[in-house]
Amino acid sequence: MNTLTISHELSKIHQVDYDSALSELSVFFKDGRAYKYFKIEPRHFSMISKLVQERKSVGKYLTEHIFNKYDQEKL
């Protein structure tokens, strides 16, 4: 399991976990909501990791590439 903590104060996202064995991405929001997305390619987690390191918008990437595009489950 790979975990990224988002420390940017303007981000609504607190943490992103990626399980490469299951290809599952879990997104945890600062307001307590959490969702798991299925069949996520490793390239998406790599890009999210890069965005976190560069302090760029993870939320924008998730909105454009993950949310409403992959099967999900509310946690």
PLM regions: where:
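Acidic/histidine-enriched, beta-strand-rich ligand/metal-binding domains
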Residues: 1-75
